Amino acid sequence: MNGEISRPPELISSRNPCKSFENAIHKAVEAELAELAKSDANGGGKSKVKGPWLPEQDEALTRLVKMCGPRNWNLISRGIPGRSGKSCRLRWCNQLDPILKRKPFSDEEEHMIMSAQAVLGNKWSVIAKLLPGRTDNAIKNHWNSNLRRKPAEQWKIPLLMSNTEIVYQLYPSMVRRISNASPKEHLPQEEETGVLSDDKMDDEAKEPPREQNSKTGVYRPVARMGAFSVCKPGYMAPCEGPLVQASRPDSLAGKFLQSLCYDPIIPSKCGHGCCNHQDSTTLSSSSVLGSEFVDYEEHSSAELDKELISISNDLNNTAWIRSGKEAEQSLKADDQFRREYAHSKFSGMVNNGVSSQMVRQDLRALS
């Protein structure tokens, strides 16, 4: 035997049990398909058959799905004459699957469909994940035939599932990610809205509105005359000569005077009536709210007017002197520029042989 040990065929076949099992399944499927192909010459799915499924076709589809599993529908369709892979898949998923519920929809399932449809809309494949044993096609047909045409009063039944529970069941990973996020990233909680019954609403409508005995805690300020007044004299300081230009409102001195004149003056007496005053009867007659709310005003004195006049005169003089210096500097700069320009031009013309008469004309034009 040249050193080779002979092994029995049983040991050789037992080395790959998975592969041998798959081969056995494929052989059984091929044999089943061959039998079905012999029974009908039009098999193989080439000539499509439209209409209801026959009991023999349902039995063959059930046997093939048990052997191959609910997958590879094109291979399964070869064993059912006249049926395509899509037709086999829809027949199994909607009718023949043993997991499906064939009883009518219960009230709990209807309420769940209504609440899920209010949140998700017409996403029937997503809604079907909430109802085990119900297909998306069955849910859609039940919604279009029964639930959508129900009167509006039946929608007031309390929903068995809230929106948050629906989202948690459909998207658990998203809910975990939100719960682990920081407080700033949390979504706002939805307010729970209850549905009132018709009897309760009628009782509340019959009851008269109750008066609010307790006052609210909102602060409401009371109107009164202020304790501070603003001094706005009706005349300005007289100015003479050229200083009138600097005493305009747009000038620096005018703005400074306005800021001094219109500053709020704090009176020596308050306006709440707690300070002593000479005649309360005369003051109460002029007040809007009575003697307790009196507005005291202090008039400007003569000394203050003299100080303001002196300040304005000093500012005007300073502004006038500054403007004169600026004008003198600008004139000097212009003269210097003319001299330099004339000198440079004269020297250039002499070098070029220009006549002295033309140079004099240019100097006269510049002067």
Swiss-Prot record:
Q: What happens when the gene is disrupted?
A: Abnormal male gametophyte (pollen) development including deformed cell wall, two-celled phenotype (one regular vegetative nucleus and one sperm cell-like nucleus, both in center) and semtimes leading to abortion.
CDD domains listed in its UniProt record: SANT
Q: Which GO terms describe its cellular component?
A: nuclear speck
Protein name from the UniProt record: Transcription factor MYB25
The protein's role, per its UniProt record: Required for male gametophyte (pollen) development.
- SMART domains documented for this protein: SANT
SUPFAM superfamilies xref list: Homeodomain-like (SSF46689)
Which signals induce this protein?
May be the target of the microRNA (miRNA) MIR393a.
Residue ranges of domain HTH myb-type in the record: 45-100, 101-151
Give the source's domain of life in one word: Eukaryota
Q: Which GO terms describe its biological process?
A: pollen development; regulation of DNA-templated transcription
Location of this chain's protein in the cell = Nucleus
Source organism (scientific name): Arabidopsis thaliana (Mouse-ear cress)
Any one GO MF annotation of this record: DNA binding
Keywords for the protein's UniProt record, in alphabetical order: DNA-binding, Nucleus, Repeat, Transcription, Transcription regulation
- Please list where the region (Disordered) is annotated: 181-216
- DNA-binding residues (ranges): 73-96, 124-147
